[in-house]
């Protein structure tokens, strides 16, 4: 075959465009170009180091396998960027008989490699769920069986559930870990009925050492699925096998759930997960940034964490949008450059200054008059600085305007107060928790208007 790099890359782009969403394709794949094609090695050039790292992590295998299928031979792909960074995408394993790529080694469960205990950020709202999940991973089938993880969308239920699977596979590689959504369980059951292979279906699920079932609330109203799951549950539980369920609500609140299933789901531990507080949201963003080799300032992390409060998925999505736009535009990563990018997608409006003052006064035990006054007593001064900091975070007011609201303080006083509290958030746990609690109360009040 004549080596025509541009022809090859155009064919690859055509195939990838059909497989990926339009935003994904246009953001990550389309800006990348082929630089060199020699024998069994392809060199691709990404526009910058950030895009290079992202492609290598999330799309390297897909690109490599696509090229291998086009060339009908094994191929190595290297990624490079103008900054001189170079990474190996992956090496393909091509089977000429089937025309499909295959991978050597033992088949593993459908577990996301990112969902491990080491990458889970523990905070006050998920501490019990994390401890229970870890206990189950260390000693399955003993203390908490079943373990039911309850919470809203994007709060970490799936992460903890899959972390249990990873932990057991690390300590016991031959363990049978089944991770399945309720929808997949139902679909497998339907196929088994159609093919008259119910016994095979039952034997498959009832040989699990750990059964992880996501979105169990979707079992509502599915009578035959509930019937089969009831007997699967009983078989595993009686054999001392671990069952972990994830739901957006407690079992007794799932409509149409058979009483006998509700009773069994509730016989173990129901661990509730609530939306993360400000401190935890900041820690999540920091951990995410470290994992992606991103250098984010505290002000940027704090800005995103303050504006995205609903769940972790929303938080990480905001970070990805921000970093992607900054990487492509070439602008520095500052709060000023992020605001136009993030604000249009955030259901956010400035909180009322009097509401912030009222909540801050109640939480700190300092009157509004003292917050606005000139007293230098330590507890009053600290409360005033916290209130100024929160006013800065939750409103669009300028520093001079904030100073006016606090009895005519100079804007440099406001700036000093905001900087001081910002520094204390990483050094003083008591201050950090107090600021987080007040911030969450402000957000809650604003959302309920």
UniProtKB/Swiss-Prot annotation:
Residues 73-109 are annotated as: Domain II. This is Chromosomal replication initiator protein DnaA. SUPFAM superfamilies: P-loop containing nucleoside triphosphate hydrolases, TrpR-like. InterPro entries: AAA+_ATPase, Chromosome_initiator_DnaA, Chromosome_initiator_DnaA-like, Chromosome_initiator_DnaA_CS, DnaA_C, DnaA_dom, DnaA_N_dom, DnaA_N_sf. The lineage of its organism: Bacteria, Bacillati, Cyanobacteriota, Cyanophyceae, Oscillatoriophycideae. Oligomerizes as a right-handed, spiral filament on DNA at oriC. GO terms for molecular function: ATP binding; ATP hydrolysis activity; DNA replication origin binding; lipid binding. It comes from the Bacteria. It comes from Picosynechococcus sp. (strain ATCC 27264 / PCC 7002 / PR-6). Transmembrane segments: none annotated. It is found in: Cytoplasm.
């Amino acid at each position: 075959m004549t080596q025509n790099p541009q022809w090859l890359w155009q064919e690859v782009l055509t195939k990838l465009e059909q497989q990926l969403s339009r935003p994904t394709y246009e953001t990550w794949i389309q800006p990348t170009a082929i630089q060199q094609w020699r024998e069994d090695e392809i060199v691709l050039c990404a526009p910058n180091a950030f895009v290079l790292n992202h492609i290598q992590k999330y799309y390297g295998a897909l690109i490599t396998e696509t090229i291998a299928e086009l060339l009908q031979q094994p191929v190595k792909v290297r990624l490079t960027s103008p900054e001189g960074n170079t990474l190996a995408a992956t090496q393909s394993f091509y089977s000429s008989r089937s025309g499909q790529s295959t991978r050597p080694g033992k088949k593993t469960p459908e577990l996301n490699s990112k969902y491990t205990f080491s990458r889970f950020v523990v905070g006050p709202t998920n501490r019990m769920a994390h401890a229970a999940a870890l206990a189950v991973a260390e000693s399955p089938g003993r203390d908490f069986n079943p373990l039911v993880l309850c919470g809203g969308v994007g709060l970490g239920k799936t992460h903890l559930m899959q972390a249990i699977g990873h932990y057991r596979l690390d300590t016991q590689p031959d363990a049978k870990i089944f991770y399945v959504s309720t929808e997949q369980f139902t679909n497998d059951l339907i196929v088994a009925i159609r093919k008259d292979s119910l016994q095979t279906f039952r034997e498959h699920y009832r040989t699990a050492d750990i059964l992880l079932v996501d979105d169990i609330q979707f079992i509502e109203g599915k009578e035959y699925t509930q019937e089969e799951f009831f007997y699967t549950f009983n078989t595993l539980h009686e054999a001392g096998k671990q069952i972990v369920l994830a739901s957006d609500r407690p079992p007794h609140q799932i409509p149409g759930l058979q009483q006998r299933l509700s009773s069994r789901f509730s016989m173990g531990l129901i661990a509730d997960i609530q939306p993360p507080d400000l401190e935890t949201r900041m820690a999540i963003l920091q951990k995410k940034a470290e994992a992606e080799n991103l250098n984010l300032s505290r002000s940027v992390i704090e800005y995103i964490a303050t504006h995205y409060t609903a769940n972790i998925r929303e938080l990480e999505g905001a970070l990805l949008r921000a970093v992607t736009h900054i990487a492509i535009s070439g602008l520095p990563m500052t709060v000023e450059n992020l605001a136009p990018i993030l604000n249009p997608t955030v259901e956010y409006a400035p909180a009322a200054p009097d509401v912030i003052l009222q909540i801050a006064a109640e939480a700190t035990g300092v009157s509004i008059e003292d917050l606005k006054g000139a007293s230098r007593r330590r507890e009053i001064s600290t409360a005033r600085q916290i209130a100024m900091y929160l006013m800065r975070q939750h409103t669009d007011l300028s520093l001079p305007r904030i100073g006016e609201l606090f009895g005519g303080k100079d804007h440099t006083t406001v700036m000093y107060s905001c900087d001081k509290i910002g520094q204390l958030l990483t050094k003083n746990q008591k201050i950090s928790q107090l600021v987080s609690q007040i911030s969450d109360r402000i957000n809650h009040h604003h959302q309920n208007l």
